[in-house]
Amino acid sequence: MNKLYIGNVSEQASALDLESIFEQWKIPFSAPFLVKSGYAFVDCPDEKVAMRAIDTLSGKVELHGKVLEVEHSVPKRQRSCKLQIRNIPPHMQWEVLDGLLAQYGTVESCEQVNTDTETAVVNVRYGAKDQAREAMDKLNGFLMENYALKVSYIPDETAAADAPAVGGRRGFNPRGPPRQGSPSLGARPKLQSDVPLRLLVPTQFVGAIIGKEGATIRNITKQTHSKIDIHRKENAGAAEKPITVHSTPEGCSSACRNIMEIMQKEAIDTKITEEIPLKILAHNNFVGRLIGKEGRNLKKIEQDTDTKITISPLQDLTLYNPERTITVKGTLDACAKAEEEIMKKVRESYENDVAAMHLQSNLIPGLNLNALGLFPGAASGGISPSVVSGPPPGAQAGYQSFGAQMESETVHLFIPALAVGAIIGKQGQHIKQLSRFAGASIKIAPADGIDAKQRMVIISGPPEAQFKAQGRIFGKLKEENFFGPKEEVKLEAHIKVPSFAAGRVIGKGGKTVNELQNLTSAEVVVPRDQTPDENDQVVVKITGHFYASQLAQRKIQEIISQVRRQQQPKPSAAGPPVARRK
């Protein structure tokens, strides 16, 4: 992208005029200017120089009474789904931009571009041409925090092939190597950069980290190729403030070390004698795996880095604050090494969770997995809030049919008897929160006996409530280390089906149930010779990990719905009978 288009060129302008402007601003060019009526083209040595020309000249330099407009030269056939957005406010929250971009369609990827300017630049790919065109029309000149956005097309190499990829989850790449897609595209990209580093720093050090007129934080940002958000306005009066670092793992670690060095220097200058520990915020979903079975993972990190690590208690969590504080004490070098190891484990956990989520997401039509709160949200700098605003484009029909099926279902989920306390929580607090969050009725059935190894959780609610409630229970068992760090949580779930539909679930010669097991990876058993209960229902047993179990439950409910529809009497052509008056 080193070829430039220069617009709004005066009829009096010549190639020499344009050459002198580029020379005046010390912008090299690698070929003569091609001047046409009202516009011109020129080649730059590389993309970085082209970006500098756009930032320096576009809308700022006048020639013969006309202000030049400079942007990437894009052939018509390549003006498809890719846009470049420039002049983004430097300290803007990425979630805000994410939400803005999402208003115009599916954002398949968004890569931040390295520039020498204070403002940020991103390359965005939309899922369709019309979405990109609408975003271009609406966002060009759009004011954000007194900065007017500048939007232009950039070459879309795939446009000629006419094969745009299917839309996926939005995510912003940090400064550094482009992420090359998003988790829901066909090829599995590297996901480490999706997990920002979240730090908690004493409020008295925030000023030193920012520096005079933001010079220090700008310097860190430039050196480490990162995007750093200091959340000064959060929790007014709090003793500590969160900092979010978006970058590659190496960039995050480098920024973390710089911030620790500044805090240590400030502590010495202000004669603070107590130790300043490193505090990392991590979503609770990942902490169980960070700790490991019997604390083995955490102990190993402590031994390898010569640090002392503590983690805030579960009681501090709420539905609105799902993060735990990991406190690391040791020398600066030791803390920096511990941060690398801790975040490596967190990123691995995130990558595994997202892989599992997207593996099954396309198999459950219309279910917006990101909206269900099973994975880190914007609070922890993870998946952004615009993702949860509704179903993905293209899944509208599925979403509506899913939403229309609001009939309540009852599922019996069997958990280890020892886990009952963790699910209920202190004075029943956790199970109440879970019930409110999921919109489901959740009850723990009495134990079958003193030596019972399992307890039954009775969950009643519509499909989405089932998904939320069961997902949180699976997650809780993992967090509380009832399963090993590399062990999948597999639970048995029982659902009741009408006896007249049991044969359809099994299929001829067991064909349907076998296909169901192959599709979902869950074990599905319809016990033979069951006596139907008083409601003429029999039990179907499903055993598997969360997504396998969910998919099997949904498929079985689909079969039941089909059977019920087929059994409904067809309406008479003559219409309903008219009631006679007595």
UniProtKB/Swiss-Prot annotation:
The modification Phosphoserine is found at residue 182. The keyword Hydrolase does not apply. InterPro entries: KH_dom (IPR004087), KH_dom_type_1 (IPR004088), KH_dom_type_1_sf (IPR036612), Nucleotide-bd_a/b_plait_sf (IPR012677), RBD_domain_sf (IPR035979), RRM_dom (IPR000504). Keywords: Cytoplasm, mRNA transport, Nucleus, Phosphoprotein, Repeat, RNA-binding, Translation regulation, Transport. It is found in: Cytoplasm; Nucleus; Cytoplasm, P-body; Cytoplasm, Stress granule. GO terms for molecular function: mRNA 3'-UTR binding; mRNA binding; N6-methyladenosine-containing RNA reader activity. Residues 164-190, 562-582 are annotated as: Disordered. Signal peptide: none annotated. Its main location: cytoplasm. Residues 2-75, 81-156 form the RRM domain. CDD domains: KH-I_IGF2BP3_rpt3, RRM2_IGF2BP3. Residues 194-259, 275-342, 408-473, 490-556 form the KH domain. GO terms for cellular component: cytoplasm; cytoplasmic stress granule; cytosol; nucleus; P-body. It comes from the Eukaryota. GO terms for biological process: CRD-mediated mRNA stabilization; germ cell development; germ cell migration; mRNA transport; nervous system development; regulation of embryonic development; regulation of translation; sex determination. RNA-binding factor that may recruit target transcripts to cytoplasmic protein-RNA complexes (mRNPs). This transcript 'caging' into mRNPs allows mRNA transport and transient storage. It also modulates the rate and location at which target transcripts encounter the translational apparatus and shields them from endonuclease attacks or microRNA-mediated degradation. Preferentially binds to N6-methyladenosine (m6A)-containing mRNAs and increases their stability. Involved in neuronal crest migration. Homodimer and multimer. All KH domains contribute binding to target mRNA. Domains KH3 and KH4 are the major RNA-binding modules, although KH1 and KH2 also contribute. They are also required for RNA-dependent homo- and heterooligomerization. The integrity of KH domains seems not to be required for localization to stress granules. Belongs to the RRM IMP/VICKZ family. This is Insulin-like growth factor 2 mRNA-binding protein 3. The gene is igf2bp3.
